[in-house]
Amino acid sequence: DELSAFIDGRLFLPDHSVIVTDDDADQSWFDLAAPVVDKYHVLATSFMITAYRQDPPPSTYVLRRSHTHDMHKAGANGKGEMVNFTADQIAADLETSAGVLGVKEVIAYPFGHYNDTAKQGVTQAGFEMARTVEPGYVTIGTDKLALPVQRINYGMGLGALESMIG
């Protein structure tokens, strides 16, 4: 994977490189964004909650990846189950998700919640990377189990996007 190789310093990526992702694989993203991705041949990653959605990708340019199987819920402390479960429970859920999607590579933490136990569960399940909701940029040496993002919200204008990317 190019992102992993970049983080390891084994691959050069040009400045202002982006990875387009979607959380939850919501139908609105499939209806509104997937046609744009398809039209412009932009590879995108859709993080799917596989307990709720298992259909094929809406385009050959959309890669389905795990947003867990069924951990998109509040746990005992009000935060996501990802920070309430044991590493074994997390790994079991991610194994189920990987079985549906047919791939282990990267997950998106539900609600962006994670801790060391969550990281252990992700690794135990055989995933290499995990994406947070923390703002930031991926650089060489970034923690692969705590990848930051630049969040783009519905209705955000082109100017805001340009200033975010640089």
Q: Where in the sequence are the language-model features?
A:
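Beta->alpha turn/N-cap motifs
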Residues: V133-E134
